[in-house]
Curated annotation (Swiss-Prot):
Cystine bridges: C3-C30, C16-C36, C20-C38
Pfam short name (any one): Defensin_2
Example of a GO cellular component annotation carried by this entry: extracellular space
Record bears the keyword Secreted: yes
Keywords noted in UniProt: Antibiotic, Antimicrobial, Defensin, Disulfide bond, Immunity, Innate immunity, Secreted
PROSITE patterns: INVERT_DEFENSINS
Listed InterPro entries: Defensin_invertebrate/fungal, Scorpion_toxin-like_sf
Family: Belongs to the invertebrate defensin family. Type 1 subfamily.
UniProt-recorded name of the protein: Sapecin-C
Presence of the UniProt keyword Disulfide bond in the record: yes
Domain of life: Eukaryota
Amino acid sequence: ATCDLLSGIGVQHSACALHCVFRGNRGGYCTGKGICVCRN
């Protein structure tokens, strides 16, 4: 969700990473399809 919502501003990867960090992951990234993928 974070990737699609902020894609127009160019901060989708940061929002996705923060979302993952809050969930206890080390970070995350957006796929080409706009899906946020968290790292373990």
